[in-house]
Design a protein with these regions (language model features):
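Short, small/polar residue-rich loop motifs at catalytic or cofactor-binding pockets
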Residues: 300, 417-420, 481-483
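Short beta-strand scaffold segments in enzyme catalytic cores
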Residues: 104, 109-116, 421-425, 485-487, ...
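Active-site rim segments in enzyme catalytic domains, especially the processed small/beta chain
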Residues: 98-102, 109-126, 131, 141, ...
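Internal maturation/activation junctions in enzymes
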Residues: 42, 337-439, 451-452, 459, ...
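Bacterial N-terminal signal peptides that target proteins for export
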Residues: 1-8
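Noncatalytic scaffold domains of N-terminal-nucleophile
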Residues: 23-73, 77, 85-263, 268-270, ...
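N-terminal signal peptide c-region/cleavage motif recognized by signal peptidases
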Residues: 16-18
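Extended C-terminal subregions enriched in glycine
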Residues: 367, 429, 477, 510, ...
């Protein structure tokens, strides 16, 4: 890897040699003297689709798309210095541990779909966490937690935060696994940008400051009634959450990244970091052991797949929820012509409330199956082949009233938000990566490992305490997981990554995004930015982004939907890219710059701070 000047060192040199003027204070719109000004002077874009916030980024040699600019630049730095798309994905994810720690950390889960150009195949990694040895339904019952038969979906009876829903983290194992199998560089190289920024700090943006909310983590008489002192020490600046424009540093995380650079994943799962995790867990009444960490292994699995308008849609399989996007698309493909007497989503169009009604009803049907069956396939048989068959989709058409909203089931407990990052990368060899990494909730469990600068996630909150459920908590089992990432192939060739973060929004968001692109013909940036809905099975509410609410909200309410207008915070964030074959580029390479015969296009959701960067 070529030697480059540290961005931190460069900034320090500039500050040392120049005096700068002090600008006006950075503040949010709501804190200005005239908040109404903000919505009154919104500009109007005239190029491309009306919905899109900017043009697509396009380039031949390599691309990184994610939710935070410094993280995207970290991945691009790796690409430009000899790394491939897999190396760039790990570097980007590590930097997001620094810049979006409420969303993602090495104490959480990881899934990835990797298209390996040399093998002409999509490989799927499940590096999600397993319940520790002592995690049983009986133990939780004795602690006062019980299954609620009136609300029996994922999460029923489980505590939402604190140490009890912490599962063994899989992210670091996954980082090392993808590097060893597909990467060109080492931990030492790909973790360097993140280590530098963790030590030197970075300024907090408005969106990051808004999301920076520590949850209660420590129990008094019940779960989670006070903040973890180690979390306050690590994530607050001068005793308070950081404000926009404030510099945030995490030297403890820098130390952890340096340990990984020198000792690899063993430092996390078998060394001093493992000892610190277990000590913290046991101090709070958790059951994780050193053996749980040392024995952790992720899995290489086969994707769930279906065909939609001739495109192969690959999604994460159980215990991830992503496969429900495939079921939604199957239902739409089979049933829309039945429901609309030969019509299509494209012929209806998004100004017609039936277009949205059909999407929503398809989502309800697929999520009913998702909540009923989704679980760790190593412990329970998930009938995925049946659920994703054309015949099964066709059998569901009669369950929907084309003119009136249905009552969905079964119930489940999900918050509106989901604190997750997604990213997409591609390189000049044709490798492409679709990646999702998460803490689950904002700052996960709220429990920080002292001295190491990372939070423990709370994904175990999506187990259930129903002893008869396939998703009931038990040792070494993976819980139901909202994380979703996908990949699209066409004619057995790689086409597009599919990523959208946002808790229970993810599978339904994937389906909406793919409909935008393949039915309506939206470009990637327009598809990322277009208004979306979010439906909750319980309490059967339909959230519509305000422009969509203004367009069809009243008509959907008249059809029986319980509708509310919301902003984009509930709608997740899309980060996608697509390969476009172009034979004219086959001879364009040189000895120093090579690339596949084509280029990449991208879409980065304006609801986040992110961007697509490329060269």
């Amino acid at each position: 890897m070529q030697k480059s000047i540290s961005p931190i060192a460069l900034m320090s040199a500039l500050v040392a040699s120049h005096a700068f003027a002090q600008g006006p204070k950075l503040q949010t719109c709501e804190s200005t003297p005239q908040p109404a000004f903000c919505s009154a002077v919104r500009g109007v874009r005239t190029e491309g689709w009306p919905a899109q916030s900017r043009s697509e980024v396009m380039a031949q040699h390599g691309m990184v798309v994610t939710s935070q600019p410094l993280a995207a630049q970290a991945g691009l730095q790796i690409l430009r210095h000899g790394g491939n798309a897999i190396d760039a994905a790990v570097a980007t994810a590590a930097m997001l541990n620094v810049t979006e720690p409420m969303m993602v950390g090495m104490g959480g889960d990881l899934f990835a779909l990797v298209y390996a150009a040399k093998e002409h195949k999509v490989f799927v990694l499940n590096a999600s966490g397993m319940a520790p040895t002592g995690a049983t339904v009986d133990r939780f019952n004795k602690l006062g937690y019980a299954w609620n038969p009136k609300n029996w979906g994922p999460g029923s009876g489980m505590p939402a935060g604190g140490i009890l829903p912490v599962t063994v983290p899989g992210a670091v194992w996954g980082w090392q696994a993808v590097l060893k199998r597909f990467g060109k560089l080492t931990f030492k190289e790909v973790l360097e940008p993140a280590a530098q920024y963790a030590q030197g700090g970075f300024p907090i943006s408005e969106r990051i400051a808004h999301d920076w909310r520590l949850p209660n983590a420590l129990p008094l008489q019940a779960c989670c009634t006070s903040l973890d002192p180690d979390s306050i020490k690590t994530w607050y600046v001068n005793g308070a959450q950081p404000r926009p424009g404030q510099i945030f540093r995490n030297p403890d995380l820098a130390r952890t990244l340096r340990l990984l650079q020198s000792k690899g994943a063993d430092a996390f799962y078998k060394g001093e970091i493992a000892q610190a995790i277990v000590a913290k867990s046991q101090a709070l009444g958790g059951s994780m052991t050193l053996e749980d960490l040392a024995g952790y292994k992720g899995e290489w699995v086969e994707p769930a797949r279906t065909q939609y308008h001739g495109y192969d849609i690959l999604e994460l399989p159980p215990p991830a929820q992503a496969w429900a996007a495939d079921e939604i698309l199957n239902i739409l493909q089979a049933c829309v012509p039945v429901w609309s007497t030969g019509g299509t989503l494209a012929s209806l169009g998004p100004a017609n409330p039936l277009y949205w009604h059909f999407l929503i009803e398809a989502k309800k049907l697929a999520y009913a199956d998702l909540y009923r069956y989704n679980a760790d396939p190593n412990f329970a048989a998930v009938p995925l082949a049946k659920l994703l068959s054309e015949a099964y989709a066709a059998s569901l058409c009669g369950k929907v009233d084309p003119q009136h909203a249905s009552i969905p089931g079964p119930p489940a407990n999900f918050s509106n938000s989901g604190d997750t990052i997604v990213l997409s990368t591609a390189d000049d060899e044709g490798n492409m990566v679709s990646w999702v990494n998460s803490n689950f909730s904002a700052f996960g469990s709220g429990v920080t490992v002292p001295g190491y600068g990372f939070i423990l996630h709370n994904r175990g909150a999506l187990f259930t305490l129903d002893p008869k459920s396939p998703n009931a908590i038990e040792p070494h089992k993976r819980p139901y997981n909202t994380l979703s990432a996908g990949f699209v192939m066409h004619d057995d060739r790689p086409l597009m990554t599919v990523t959208l973060m946002g808790g229970d929004m993810q599978a339904q968001g994937h389906a909406q995004l793919l409909v935008d692109i393949f039915d309506l013909g939206a470009n990637l940036q327009a598809g990322a930015d277009m208004a979306r809905f979010r439906h909750a099975q319980v309490p059967n509410t339909l959230s519509l982004e305000t422009p969509l609410y203004d367009l069809v909200g009243a008509k959907l309410a008249a059809m029986g939907h319980t509708v509310k207008s919301v902003n984009g915070e509930e709608m997740g964030g899309v980060q996608i890219l697509m390969f476009v074959a172009d034979p004219s580029l086959a001879q364009a390479g040189t000895d120093t710059i090579k690339h596949v015969a084509g280029y990449y296009r991208s879409g980065s959701d304006f609801r986040k701070d992110g961007e697509a960067v490329a060269w």
